[in-house]
Amino acid sequence: MRIGIIGLGRMGGNIAVRLTRHGHDVVVHDRTSEVTTSVVGRCEAGRATPADTLADMAKLLEGDEHRVVWVMLPAGAITEDCVQQLGGLLGRGDIIIDGGNTYYKDDVRRSAELAEKGISYVDVGTSGGVWGLERGYCMMFGGTKETAEYIDPILSALAPGIGDVPRTPGRDEAGHDPRAEQGYLHCGPAGSGHFVKMVHNGIEYGMMQAFAEGFDIMKSKNSPILAEKDRFELNMGDIAEVWRRGSVVSSWLLDLTAEALTRSETLNEFSGEVADSGEGRWTIEAAIEEDVPAPVMTAALFTRFRSRSGNNFAEKILSAQRFGFGGHVEKK
């Protein structure tokens, strides 16, 4: 199968490479031509074609039963502009996929607008960060059933597969989507994929914050505000490591935390000023709309706000985790 990919950053480029490794062909475009050239060079030989412009990409994809274009750009105006341009370049039967972190209500609107032109729209919440090339991507997507079936070869190639994760008892019973244990899921109509990914990221905020606070408490057990007899000098890297081995809180986030603390007990390479990319805010907005209490996620989001006005070790833990799973660097 052939697909166009727009935006070849940390995830978009790796998505292109992974698809070619699984026998698919890609037409790739990035606003920086050097990036496009680099990604083509990383792809399997003969399976990647560069496109200079969006119009060039649309032309190169002509002849396919349905032209499919995956947009992997930052949420907001840049993605909105790209989708609008594609809406004018593609036609009836073609498919636009937004694999970024778009606000789900924008997906609902775009889907309706594009449907008037006969263009299908799929929103894919994509998790996996810089590790997705080798591990695969966990994907939650929304769109019509027919479109989901057509792009299944693309999604199944990107997904991690069942791997060595134990199967959940009862999964063979009727009513369970077999794609879920392969690492990708058709959640429902347009907007539902990004909605589920939005909540996923809200949960991520809470989990990260719990680790950050816990390590901060342990580090501060040697604080001068305590009487000397009450102090413990604890090794953060060793504690993170032992927790990885069979504890209830073992997880990928803990793995990344252990790596960071093994490299540097103080995490002084991080300022502790923690960004938020929008999904946490949208999750809280959804909770308010639904009258659902979400105190943990709300506190985690507000802590990120606080981090930008005063630094402490907890925020350095968060920065280290974000760098570990997504290659996110702190804003200077």
Swiss-Prot record:
Class of this enzyme: oxidoreductase
Keyword NAD in annotation: yes
Keywords from the UniProt entry: Gluconate utilization, NAD, Oxidoreductase
E.C. number(s) listed in UniProt: 1.1.1.343
One GO MF term attached to the UniProt entry: NADP binding
Subunit structure: Homotetramer.
Record-given protein name: 6-phosphogluconate dehydrogenase, NAD(+)-dependent, decarboxylating
Species this protein is from: Gluconobacter oxydans (strain 621H) (Gluconobacter suboxydans)
